[in-house]
Design a protein with these regions (language model features):
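Compact soluble domain cores
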Residues: 1-100
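Short, compact, well-ordered microdomains
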Residues: 87-135
Length: 135
């Protein structure tokens, strides 16, 4: 495993209660449920999609059947992002990581927002949503 951009704790990822808070490695190891892409982020008919599917298609030319490519894109480029903790929602701690210059498989470059949540019963976060912002 590659260490964080800050190099804290060597090659071990640092979680939210470590010195300085979570590092990129902790998010890189987090859970990304591929069904979230297929059933929500890439589905324009999902009632809560709010244009996310159109953004993925227009910016990175990704859509149904491309969940693995989207996961790879996030995991490989998450180190560019600033880690910003958000207000907790219910029992979940939350973070936003904006990848400022995400390069899609089609070569397009655009900011990509990733949002993560941590269930207190788990050790790693899960991706809650993600969508590109127009360049």
């Amino acid at each position: 495993m590659v260490g964080s951009a800050l190099g804290r704790q060597g090659d071990r990822p640092v979680g939210p209660d470590g010195p300085g808070g979570p590092d990129h490695g902790w998010f890189r190891q987090g859970t990304i449920d591929l069904r979230k892409f297929e059933r929500y982020l890439f589905d324009p008919d999902h009632p809560q999609n709010e244009g996310k599917a159109e953004g993925w298609r227009k910016v990175f030319d990704l859509g149904p059947g491309d969940a693995l490519a989207a996961e790879r894109l996030i995991r490989e480029q998450i180190d560019q992002a600033e880690i910003v903790e958000q207000e907790p929602k219910g029992r979940y701690r939350r973070w936003e990581l904006l990848i400022p210059d995400c390069v899609g498989p089609n070569g397009n470059v655009a900011p990509l927002l990733t949002a993560w949540a941590l269930d207190p019963d788990n050790k790693l976060p899960h991706l809650s949503t993600s969508f590109p912002r127009p360049p």
